[in-house]
Structure formats: C-alpha cells, structure tokens
C-alpha cells in the first residue's frame, strides 16, 4: 500500500493520546497526509462497542471482550485503515492488535496464541509498519489517571491489573518485529523527541 501504518500502544496513563496529537501536527507540517484513529472506536459501530466495553456497569469474560474487539477491528480495517493507506495517508492509530494480546490474551487469561489466531485475518490484510510502545511504571501511570479524573472500566482497575498490563507490553515488545519500546517517564517533549526519531527513520525508507 502507498501509505504507512503507525500504531501507538502502551499501558493506560503512558501518554499515547498526547504523543499522537504531537505526531499528527509534526507530520502535517512536513507535508504528509495524516489520519489519526483509534481502537476501539474508530468507526460509528466501533464507538458503540467502545462504550459497551468501557462501561463499568458491564462485567465481561475476557473472550467476550476479545470477540467484541475483533468485530470493531473488522469495521475499522475495512472502512478506515485500508482506504486511507491505499490513498497514501500516514495512519496513526491509538491501539491495535498488541493491545488485544496484552489486555485479553495475557491479563484476562484468554491466551496469547488464541488472540493471535483470532486476529490473523486482519494481519493477512494489513500489517503495521511500526509499533511504538510507550511504557510507564504503573505507580506513575495511576497517578496520572487520577489527576486526569479518568473513571472508565480500565482506569478504575486495581494496581495489580495495571502492573500486569505494564509487564505485558514489556513482554510483547520482545515478541514481535517492528516494535520500538519507549520509556515515557520524561517530559512530553523528551518523549516526543524519541518518538519523532523513530518515525523519521521509518519515513526515510519510503
């Protein structure tokens, strides 16, 4: 495909959303066509799935979560990601398959291999050119979430949950190619400088 597919992953509170906004601005200033999107929630159907998944009123089995996320991903890949990449856009996505592997495969106990199998149909269609994994110690990440007043289902999980997510992203960053792990404990600008360098390296290969 003509475009490039960049995915931001990481534990909650690591600053993904902030970095994605900075990357979007940076790339547009350099003349690139850019689409920013997210999973779940990058389509109208996905937005409804996101509300369901993050609503604290609903307690779900890990496999149920994984199947809902796969439904969201199918809509997203077909209606947003593939068209944008075919049109030559740089697509910057907040979460993709690695999040399913960590949250449902590892933390919820569905199993890494099961999540990989479930999502293999999407890997046959498109693959990210770069995974940027932002990791932040769960102690600091939880402080950030509290300061931001976040209160959805994931944000209100206990410390052990957030520790497992943090360790899960550390683990998957070693399992898959095209993953760059960036420690997110510095200032926003410090982290962005690291992010910018790996994105510049990718785009030089065009």
Swiss-Prot record:
Keyword Iron annotated: no
PROSITE patterns, A to Z: THYMIDYLATE_KINASE
GO cellular component: cytosol
A GO biological process held by the record: dTDP biosynthetic process
Keyword Kinase: yes
Reaction equations catalysed: dTMP + ATP = dTDP + ADP
EC code(s) of this entry: 2.7.4.9
InterPro entries hit by this protein: P-loop_NTPase, Thymidylate_kin-like_dom, Thymidylate_kin_CS, Thymidylate_kinase
Sections of the chain in a coiled coil: none
HAMAP family linked to this entry: Thymidylate_kinase
Cited function: Phosphorylation of dTMP to form dTDP in both de novo and salvage pathways of dTTP synthesis.
Family recorded in the similarity comment: Belongs to the thymidylate kinase family.
Name of the protein this chain belongs to: Thymidylate kinase
Annotated source species: Caldicellulosiruptor saccharolyticus (strain ATCC 43494 / DSM 8903 / Tp8T 6331)
